[in-house]
């Protein structure tokens, strides 16, 4: 299914090794070569992989110092994507409130939500997700 404006909530727990990270891609383009999707990066700030908003560069580093994420525990992530505005809460604390000025049109089109895992430093790592819920926001 493709989503345009929505709120996604989920719990995650992630490996604490090195630069290993995971992520949630928003409105991911389905055709190759169009461009990158918004990604809510899920990682360890101490390793340079904070929970924050990434496109082809960091748009907002969010929990850069790991002040909100709880290592080795379940963490609650809530993501709201309405038009060019992306908001993220980690454990009920707002960590990203970003409005993309003049984004490429493809970033505002409906697309799938994708979960990602990304090994680093030769380490496969792991991530677990649970309690996922998506609420679609209807256009007014």
Model-derived segments and spans:
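Carbohydrate-interacting regions of secretory-pathway proteins
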Residues: 1-140
